[in-house]
Structure formats: C-alpha cells, structure tokens
Amino acid sequence: VFSVFGGTYNRTVSANLGMSYSICNVLKESGTDNIGRWLPFEMDPFEMRNRLRNKMIRPTTIPQTYEDLLIEQAVSREALRLAFYHHKSLARSLKGTQQQRDVGQIFEQAGGGETLIKMMDLDMIIGSGGVLSHAPKRAQSALMMMDAYEPEGITMLTVDSIFMMPHLGVLSEHFFDAARQVFEYDCIVKCGHCIAPVGQAKPGEVAITVSGDGVSESVKVGEIKVIPAGRGEFRELGEFRELTVTPSRGLDIGAGKGKAVTQKFEGGTVGIIIDARGRPLNLSPDVKERVGKNREWLEAMGLPLP
C-alpha cells in the first residue's frame, strides 16, 4: 500500500496477504465469516475453506463460474482491508518533536502518534493488482475498493488498466516523460467519483441529494446509486460537470455535517457513484438480510446477480 497525505509518502508491504499462494493467509487472518459477509448468496464455511485451499495449491487457476469470481472478489476485499489496516497502523506521525529515526525508534513509535491516513482528505484511490485490474467489469473493481477502503467524502476511484504500474516505475528511472505519458493516457482508468457521506442515519431516510446540470438524485440511507456517464449531461468520458451535493443534517461529505459541497465531477467508465451506506460501513449480522443487501448493491452497480 502506497499513500501520500500532507506531502508525506508512506509505503508498506503485506507480503503474507495475496490471492494465490498466500490466499489461505487471508482466510486465516479474516475468517470465513468476514469473507462470507461480502457474498450475495449463503455459503457453507467448510465449502469455502475447501475452495480457497484448492486455489492455494493451484494458484494459476482463474475463476470458472460467476460464483467462483464472486468468492475470489470477496477474499480480495478482505486482503485489501487487512493490508490497508496494516498500512494505517504504521503510517503514523512521531511522538513529540523528535524527527530523526533509527530502526529501534520506528518500532518504539509505531503506535505513538496519530495515523497519517485521513480518508476525508483523500482525492484519488488507484487500485492495482490482478483482481482489480483484470476484473471483468470496472464496476466490480470500484465496488471492491469501496467495500475494502471505505472512502469518505468525495474520492475519484481509478484502476491500473492492465497492472502495468510496477513496470512504469522501472521505466521512469530511464525515460521519465515516456513513463508519465503512458501512466496518464494508458495506465489509469477512471471509474468515476465516489460520494460517501460519513456518519450514521436511520435506514430509509434521505441521506444525500445531488443536483445541477440536468442531474437530480436523492439517495436513501443504506443505498448505492450510480449516475451513468451516458446519462443527462454526462455524454462523454472525461467530461466534467459542476454538481451540488447536499448531505442530511447528521452526515458529512467534507464541509461539515449537513453542509453542501459544489464542485466538478467526472463520470468515468462506471459513473458517479453515490454510496449512502454510511461510514463506518456496518453490515447486518443477519445472514439473509445481508445477502439481500449485497444483491441489491450489485444491481445498483449494474452488475449481474448469481
């Protein structure tokens, strides 16, 4: 996980979390319940463990059915969530005024200062790696990032088109301008802006309204709604439109609780995604209710049901 907040660059590596040889590490760290909570169908924990262990011993296999794909994407949500939690725990400010660090101080002060990761200040998330880059639909990549990272406020969701960022990093050491151009025009694929209010409200109440330039939408608490790039004024990808986003009284999208924000938005390949599920994201403990919600959110993103 790489991040830049307030001009401070941080990098962490969670080498034990992956989707091939180390997929069972994700299973061990998160458990079957946490993986199963992202599935739009009920699954026996024993069957889930068997499927993931088969993936571990045959790491080059790809999902053969839509159900297999949904299971793999559920595991990826947990891998991303755990890696991000690890990153937040290490990306912290130092205690006091001490700035010089040696190895010992890094471990002593790892839990000392506040985390540098402020999701409300984040402008863009770039998802890279096999599961995100090679998902059959970009909306699947966007939903995985929304579930795992829980972006707050207004955030542009993007993916690495064909998992080329590591190669561009090497290329940039010798041909910086060429690498930058490829990065901007061929690597980064914009899924669209995600609008996610922070806070909790009663289910069924209107959480957020979006208006301006031919768009008028109201989204209730617990719902996801997508304004497609081809609808209304969003006729072309990469085209910006100025919209006003107004959260309900107890919710915040960056300007304060209940305060509206007016800015330019970009639809991207998915559209403008309004995520009114609340932050932090709380899923129902009832299995049937949770499965129903997952199916509802898949449909809202324009994705097929299993």
Model-flagged regions — what are they?
Residues F2-P306:
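Helical "lid/coupling" subdomains associated with nucleotide-phosphate turnover
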